Amino acid sequence: MIRATFVAHTAAPSGAELATLRLLSAIRNSSTRLILEPSMVYTEDGPMVNAMKSQGISTSVLANTFDSRSVTIRGSGWLRRLAGATSLVRVGWSLGAAVREHGADVLVAGSTKALIMSAVAAKRARIPLIWHVHDRISAEYFGAALAFLIRILGKLVADGYIANSRSTESSLRPGRLPGVIAYPGLDFRGTPDTEHTPQRPASETIIAVVGRLIQWKGQDVFLRALANAKVRPQRVYLVGGTFFGEEPFRTELEDLASELQLPVTFTGHLDDPTDILSITDILVHCSVIAEPFGQVVVEGLRAGCAVIATQPGGPAETIESGVHGLLVQAGDTGQLTAALDRLIEDRDLRIRLAQAGRDRARRFDIADSAQTVGAFLSDMVARRSTTPLAGRRV
């Protein structure tokens, strides 16, 4: 039995953290549990701690004084980033002691911050380190210099990687570093499909955008595109919350929706958007930069929505445009307006896309990803036991 400890720097319910919850739950509830025993360590408290525990996953919070919010990608100078990295190293030393005490066989880092901490911890515990990459390591997100350094860091300290899409994997430029792709899928075996409300006439449509309210998710682009649509929907739901320091963007969106006279309801964060998706005619994913994967796209397909999503990025691996949904270029307001017009006005097209989308969603079963991850981690532990220095190369 391989004991795998997953590490996260935050316990806030964002995309990567929810994906990890689904993955570990799938491991525990499938045949993968016969070869892999997962546990979770957070370096701060938050809602995900109880969410993990509720699924029967061994979960702990490492006591420390470091505030992960003090180190941000955007708006931070190099001196502040260096100070933050130093703090992460200190937390990593404590993490190593805890991991060694718990007898973990492999450490899985779920973010760049977690990678820095886990590099120290894995070294101290003398176990392999796997980088679970949920973000594209690209200039558009991290900046060119920092993206380059993160790639180098990953190759130096990680024995292998798990990427959440081909798009994410390509941004790593992993070279000879071993790795696998494990999509952040959905639980098709433990949760039944929900019934979807029949697609409505054009003037009665309901549109939803699901995702954290942050600028790169493009909710402002969506509102402007919708304002130019020939037929306005009956109702629009913006589903998603904000993290520390992001509240002003929600205010901007509320003001914009009011200015454009759009029928928008802001729901805030929802642990499970299924009820809204079940009554939504059109789900719009509108990120303005390449999305690493886009879990909500698969959720919308499964729910029976007609989906519009942006490319490049993970959604282009999920949707064949015109078959399972429609793809538009990220940040292109004109293309998004045209796609909205096409779907709002063509109810039959919405029905066809929604039916094909439900079938397509089944290709992203989290049980399959659990098997992929279980086999990969077992292989990496076996490699390390025979070649202790494997993976420590650029």
Q: Which residues fall in each region the model found?
A:
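A conserved mid-protein helix/loop that constitutes part of the nucleotide-sugar donor-binding site
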Residues: 17-25, 205, 209-228, 248, ...
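Glycosyltransferase donor-sugar binding loop
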Residues: 40-46, 210, 235-251, 266
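Short acidic/histidine- and often glycine-rich active-site loop of Leloir-type glycosyltransferases
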Residues: 52, 311-322, 326-327
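Nucleotide-activated donor-binding/catalytic signature segment of Leloir-type glycosyltransferases, i.e.
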Residues: 59, 250-270
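Donor nucleotide-sugar binding/catalytic pocket of nucleotide-sugar-dependent glycosyltransferases
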Residues: 60-63, 155-193
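Short His-centered aromatic/hydrophobic patch
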Residues: 109-115, 133
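Short hydrophobic beta-strand element within catalytic cores of glycosyltransferases
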Residues: 306-309
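Conserved acidic donor-binding segment of nucleotide-sugar-dependent glycosyltransferases
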Residues: 321-322, 326-334, 342-348, 362
